């Protein structure tokens, strides 16, 4: 008889809990409560489990600390982490939740800065929205990214102008853009003192990058003589002092910057570095918490803060006072704790301590007792004092002023154009108020196009930094892909056709030269009105024969015709005339008006123009304009007939149409394909032959494909009698058909002879 199988042992229970549930199940309940955001419940579950365990669990201590930190019970959370530290050294990454709780305690979590703006400087207003109205000339000349007066202004492809050091590197801007010559000269003229200040600061930063701190410090001191309260210069000098290990001076400058601009993250970072050099770890942690309160997503600062927390808050956790057990006993009795396992743990600690049975059991007893001491919150007052030493205690001491709790009083850092008032005053030079009250002294010579020698109209800046009128630049690029002034290659600009207006230059002209701009616009409007006239000075393309309703694709590569096509598009007419060249007159007497349907531009500036014939005209006179021909013209229309003449015309129309269809059908397949690919399908016969002023569309299509000399085509184009044109087409078809038949008969005869 085989023995009965032994049942498996029951899962471990949690002896101190009211319900005898497995530890794993209770742990899952706590984790679920934490994930659901019920941190108070999670903390109570983890604490009850720890109190009921015979041996404390480090992972449970960490869970308890995380839950308490999330619940805002920071002194108790600190005790839980102290308990974990007694069971094993804490790692910085284990303190993420505690760090988050401390950051929330600072009181700025509701107004974080974007992770994309780690410097703490206010973001530029969105490019897509309307810009706020500038309050002063200097604000108009400010960089939209750093909010300071433009320094080495660079105009981006989008038309926005920023400081050169504010240009964001990346694959989107493979071509290095140079300083805008026009705007740079304007800044030097209007703000000479501040431009000198920015030059000195730029030289100092350059020397800093070249690892020449002494020379950089000299330039920085010279710049600070001009603007003693400039925060960026104060922080630059603080960084130089850090490099030279002069931590006291670095702390002095960083503190001044933080006092001037409390919401500047970089100021608190530099201050933390200086304090670290002086060994003042608690203050280092405080500055890191300020940084994280301003920008919770700054991971590098978060990691450093967690490292400092290990040093500041948990360095002495292992050295708990020797009489810990008696202290635990007295506090447990005072607070009425009566867990059986807790009392057993205390007795175990006492026995181990008094009997000295072994060093190992003594250490175990003290460790278990100290863990319980911390997780039960018996170290609360000490932990509260420790936190008060690193967190701001009195709003009147400056924190409330630096980091206001009232949302209405707090500066909205994400709103376009809004930065702290202190910020604006500090970023101005000492003479800025005088300069702004006088306004900008501008004249036409400050914004003169080097090509047309007139006021810039629709200013466009090249990558090399030169600014021209849009139309002037396009005309120059028609001839060569080079800058008209410095001869730099502009092949990329020509290929992209990214001619965006330089917004700042246009706005300055609009605000300070309104009368001159009005005169310049009047001249431009007059030119456009003249160019849009479709009877006088009509642009003429001298190239090939064109017919009404027939497609006429063109490859435009000559500079004069590039200009002509561009003007046709800009005026909105999208029309130009097509004529043949004449040996003596220069232009043929008759031509066809074409309408542009599409323009496809190539990187070299040439283009393919898809056009179609619209109407016929006769040239009255012609002349030249900017290299291409123009003409005064009169449009031609067919003379309409009625009565018996109309009946005769209708019969002739049907007959010639049928004759044309038969001729096309008799062509070889290869020739048909060539004709169809170039001219398209033959239009259908129209029921009313006189419905179109230029005549039936099929008649022009057949004239375009018939093998005729240009002189004959031109003569038919100028006819205003539909009957005469149809008779001419019939005669041509008869002649061509006879020739085709003769060739066929000759070919057949040769085959018979062979």
UniProtKB/Swiss-Prot annotation:
GO terms for biological process: motor behavior; negative regulation of neuron apoptotic process; neuromuscular process; neuron apoptotic process; neuron projection development; protein quality control for misfolded or incompletely synthesized proteins; spinal cord motor neuron differentiation. GO terms for cellular component: cytoplasm. A zinc finger (RING-type) spans 449-487. This is LON peptidase N-terminal domain and RING finger protein 2. TPR repeats lie at residues 23-58, 59-91, 197-230, 231-264, 266-298, 447-483. GO terms for molecular function: misfolded protein binding; ribonucleoprotein complex binding; ubiquitin protein ligase activity; zinc ion binding. Residues 115-125 have a biased composition (Low complexity). Keywords: Metal-binding, Repeat, TPR repeat, Zinc, Zinc-finger. Residues 528-737 form the Lon N-terminal domain. Signal peptide: none annotated. Residues 112-136, 398-439 are annotated as: Disordered.
């Amino acid at each position: 008889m085989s023995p009965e199988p032994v049942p498996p042992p029951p899962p471990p229970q949690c002896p101190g809990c009211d319900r005898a549930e497995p530890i794993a199940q209770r742990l899952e309940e706590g984790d679920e409560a934490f994930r659901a955001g019920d941190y108070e419940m999670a903390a109570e579950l983890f604490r009850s489990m720890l109190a009921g365990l015979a041996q404390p669990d480090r992972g449970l201590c960490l869970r308890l600390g995380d839950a308490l930190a999330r619940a805002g019970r920071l002194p108790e959370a600190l005790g839980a982490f102290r308990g974990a530290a007694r069971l094993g050294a804490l790692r910085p990454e284990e303190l993420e939740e505690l760090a988050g709780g401390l950051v929330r305690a600072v009181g700025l979590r509701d107004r974080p800065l974007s992770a994309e703006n780690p410097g703490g400087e206010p973001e530029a207003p969105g490019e897509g929205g309307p810009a706020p109205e500038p309050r002063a000339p200097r604000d108009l000349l400010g960089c939209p990214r750093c909010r300071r007066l433009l320094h080495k202004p660079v105009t981006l492809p989008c038309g926005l102008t920023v400081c050169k050091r504010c240009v964001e590197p990346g694959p989107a801007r493979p071509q290095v853009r140079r300083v805008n010559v026009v705007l740079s000269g304007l800044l030097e003229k209007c703000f000479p003192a501040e431009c000198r200040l920015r030059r000195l600061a730029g030289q100092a930063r350059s020397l800093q990058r070249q690892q020449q701190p002494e020379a950089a410090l000299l330039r920085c001191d010279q710049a600070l003589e001009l603007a003693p309260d400039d925060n960026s210069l104060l922080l630059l000098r603080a960084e130089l002092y850090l490099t030279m290990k002069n931590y006291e001076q670095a702390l002095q400058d960083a503190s001044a910057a933080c006092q001037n601009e409390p919401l500047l993250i970089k100021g608190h970072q530099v201050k933390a570095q200086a304090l670290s050099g002086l060994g003042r770890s608690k203050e280092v942690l405080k500055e890191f918490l300020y940084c994280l309160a301003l920008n919770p997503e700054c991971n590098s600062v978060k990691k450093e803060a967690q490292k400092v927390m290990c040093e500041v808050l948990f360095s002495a956790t292992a050295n708990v006072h020797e009489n810990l057990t008696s202290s635990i006993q007295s506090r447990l009795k005072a607070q009425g704790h009566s867990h059986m396992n807790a009392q057993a743990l205390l007795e175990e600690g006492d026995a181990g301590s008094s009997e000295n049975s072994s060093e190992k059991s003594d250490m175990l007893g003290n460790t278990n007792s100290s863990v319980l001491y911390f997780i039960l919150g018996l170290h609360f007052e000490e932990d509260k004092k420790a936190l008060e030493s690193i967190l701001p205690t009195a709003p009147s001491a400056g924190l409330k002023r630096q980091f206001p709790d009232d949302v209405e009083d707090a500066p909205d850092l994400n709103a376009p154009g809004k930065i702290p008032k202190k910020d604006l005053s500090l970023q101005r030079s000492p003479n800025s108020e005088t300069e702004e009250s006088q306004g900008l002294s501008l004249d036409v010579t400050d914004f003169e196009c080097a090509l047309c020698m007139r006021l810039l109209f629709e200013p466009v800046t090249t990558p090399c930094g030169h600014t021209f009128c849009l139309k002037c630049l396009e005309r120059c690029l028609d001839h060569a892909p080079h800058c008209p002034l410095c001869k730099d290659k502009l092949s990329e600009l020509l290929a992209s056709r990214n001619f965006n207006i330089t917004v700042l230059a246009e706005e300055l002209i609009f605000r300070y030269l309104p009368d001159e701009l009005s005169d310049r616009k009047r001249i431009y409007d007059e030119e456009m009105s003249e160019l849009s006239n479709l009877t006088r000075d009509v642009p003429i393309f001298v190239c090939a024969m064109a017919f009404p309703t027939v497609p006429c694709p063109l490859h435009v590569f000559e500079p004069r015709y590039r200009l002509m096509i561009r003007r046709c598009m800009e005026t909105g007419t999208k029309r130009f005339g097509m004529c043949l060249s004449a040996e003596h007159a220069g232009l043929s007497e008759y031509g066809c008006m074409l309408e542009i349907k599409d323009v496809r531009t190539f990187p070299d500036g040439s283009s393919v123009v898809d056009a179609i014939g619209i109407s016929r005209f006769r040239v009255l006179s012609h002349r030249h304009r900017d290299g291409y021909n123009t003409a005064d013209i009169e449009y031609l229309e067919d003379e309409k007939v009625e009565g018996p003449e109309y009946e005769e015309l209708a019969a002739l129309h049907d007959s010639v149409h049928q004759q044309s269809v038969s001729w096309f059908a008799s062509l070889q397949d290869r020739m048909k394909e060539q004709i169809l690919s170039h001219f398209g399908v033959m239009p259908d016969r129209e029921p009313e032959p006189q419905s179109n002023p230029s005549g039936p569309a099929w008649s022009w299509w057949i004239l375009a494909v018939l093998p005729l000399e240009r002189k004959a085509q031109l003569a038919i184009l100028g006819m205003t009698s539909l009957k005469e044109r149809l008779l001419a087409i019939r005669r041509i078809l008869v002649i061509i058909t006879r020739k085709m038949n003769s060739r066929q008969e000759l070919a057949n005869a040769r085959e018979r002879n062979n």
